[in-house]
Amino acid sequence: MNSSGLLCDNERPRHRPFLIGVSGGTASGKSTVCAKIMELLGQNKVDHHQRKVTIVSQDSFYRVLTPEQKAKALKGQYNFDHPDAFDTEFMCQTLKDIVEGKVVEVPTYDFVTHSRLPEKICVYPADVVLFEGILVFYTQEVRDMFHMKQFVDTDSDVRLSRRVLRDMNRGRDLEQILTQYTTFVKPAFEEFCLPTKKYADVIIPRGVDNMVAINLIVQHIQDILNGDICKWQRGSVNGHNHGRSLKRGVAEHGENPSGSSSNLTKRPLLEPSTRPH
């Protein structure tokens, strides 16, 4: 404790956060969904030291490229959507530290130069941590750390149009963008990302446009912040129970008058996009 009577960062009581994984294809709207959740919870205006909910992106864990790889990346010839593009070991250790309530630093990745910036992002202990990325469910060791898993399901044409606009704003030409998409992005989505959809407790069609889903998830997180987190820390509530209870809530909102379930209810619901590659 310092002279003013306040606890320093390394003296704060540590607690285990509720870890939520948010996956989905490139430009599906994962980052925007997370940002909307933060906004609705009123956490986006709270000082980073005091936030009860925080966001960490898998983008921070892209590997440092060799000169040869960087040259390919600048030509749109490097596969950023393959599992090997990420430093999985570093990512796993960082998540373990977060779950243990530690203060961690994660890299800032520059998608224009394809390199890590000197500035790092400091992630402080929070009650709920949203970890978003295209392949956050791919590795079992990472997947098993999540207490809840959400998949943002957005139409492929919408994702492509968003990606084209985003990458052109970064100075890339249309031909390079489309070549990279057909050569790397689309095949990698179908091989590595889409199959992990089956692990999701919550599926969010149309992303941030689906405010019914967003509001249900926000309410669920609010319940955790209001006390359920204490229950699951004591062992009476676990991550799978949280996922099932949310599914039931979504199903109740998604039933048709005939009593049959809409597409919304096949699995619960969440999204516009700031995917790098």
Swiss-Prot record:
Gene Ontology process terms (BP): CTP salvage; UMP salvage
GO MF terms held by the record: ATP binding; cytidine kinase activity; uridine kinase activity
Pathway in which the depicted protein is active: Pyrimidine metabolism; CTP biosynthesis via salvage pathway; CTP from cytidine: step 1/3; Pyrimidine metabolism; UMP biosynthesis via salvage pathway; UMP from uridine: step 1/1
Protein residues bound to substrate: D81, Y109, H114, R163, R172, Q180
Region (Disordered): 241-277
CDD domains: UMPK
InterPro entries for the chain: P-loop_NTPase (IPR027417), PRK/URK (IPR006083), Uridine_kinase-like (IPR000764)
Keywords tagged on the record: ATP-binding, Kinase, Nucleotide-binding, Transferase
One Pfam family from the record: PRK
Catalytic activity: uridine + ATP = UMP + ADP + H(+); cytidine + ATP = CMP + ADP + H(+)
Keyword Transferase: yes
EC nos: 2.7.1.48
Role according to the record: Phosphorylates uridine and cytidine to uridine monophosphate and cytidine monophosphate. Does not phosphorylate deoxyribonucleosides or purine ribonucleosides. Can use ATP or GTP as a phosphate donor.
Record family assignment: Belongs to the uridine kinase family.
PANTHER family named in the record: URIDINE KINASE
Name the UniProt record assigns to this protein: Uridine-cytidine kinase 1
The species this protein was found in: Danio rerio
Name of the gene encoding the protein in the UniProt record: uck1
